[in-house]
Amino acid sequence: MSLQERVTDLESRLAFQDDTIQALNDVLVAQQRAVERLQLQMAALLKRQEEMVGQFESFEEEAPPPHY
């Protein structure tokens, strides 16, 4: 294999590696956005659950209805 062929081969590999790195970066960015969205949804669900628990606790604190 001549020096020129080796250089051409290395340049080709470098180009493929650059494409692969860019594709991996795109996937990573998309995953990070998805994680951030899920974190926001989880926080909203936790807040909603705490509100529901608070409503249930206040319901339990009410005096029981009179019985006949």
Swiss-Prot record:
Similarity annotation: Belongs to the SlyX family.
Upper lineage: Bacteria, Pseudomonadati, Pseudomonadota, Gammaproteobacteria, Pseudomonadales
Name under which the protein is recorded: Protein SlyX homolog
NCBIfam families recorded: PRK00295.1
Domain of life: Bacteria
Short name of any one Pfam family annotated for the protein: SlyX
Entry-linked InterPro entries: SlyX
HAMAP family: SlyX
